[in-house]
Amino acid sequence: TLGAVTGKVALGSKRETERAIASAQAAFPDWAATSPLTRARVMFRFKELIEKNMEELMVLVSSEHGKVLSDAKGSIQRGLEVVEFACGIPHLLKGEFSDSVSAGMDVYSMRQPLGVCAGITPFNFPAMVPMWMFPVAIACGNTFVLKPSEKDPSCPMRLAELMIEAGAPPGVLNVLNGDKESVDTLLTDPRVQAISFVGSTPIARYVFATASLNGKRVQSMGAVSYTHLRAH
């Protein structure tokens, strides 16, 4: 409310975005080959670090977004629930097997990581929405490039630091502060295999159309609380 500067971060360009993607791509083979149990241990440690640093994260959200501390804490706790879900990844990654579906034929399925995934998140939930995305993707053996809102980037950046402290190797999680140029690079770069987006409906449509046109798996969610009026 006083208009004070809370911090400064570098605004990434296409070049920085490509470097983040390259970092994630380089880290992918070793991380994908890491056992699900080891990845789960990283998630358990990440969960503990979030709980340990809850007060700091609350202040970061409140100071940049403007949420009251109780609201900031609630949003972090909702994101933490997804981290807790990701801790169970050894069980969640189990495949399926069907014996003798036909003469001399069995059928089985396996769940395998895709590669480099990216998440584009909005201003209103700088902790919760990023934690909807990168913990599960990373627990599954993917590497991740997170592009949070440039309006309140400090909490996502701190979460990345905690992820590294938890044991995630370099390049597994990359945080990029950028604008539309960075977004377009993520949507079109062939090294990015999947995109997750939360934000306004017009941008959600743009993200879905652009990313799918470039052959990516897309999860694109626009605004909530729709009102649908129909003539009777």
How does the language model describe each region?
Residues 3-93:
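Glycine-rich loop-to-alpha-helix module at the N-terminal edge of alpha/beta enzyme cores
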Residues 1, 22, 220-222:
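Short, flexible turn/loop "capping" segments at secondary-structure junctions
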Residues 1-11, 128, 228-232:
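Short intrinsically disordered, low-complexity coil segments enriched in acidic
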Residues 85, 95-230:
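Rossmann-like NAD(P) dinucleotide-binding subdomain of oxidoreductase/dehydrogenase enzymes
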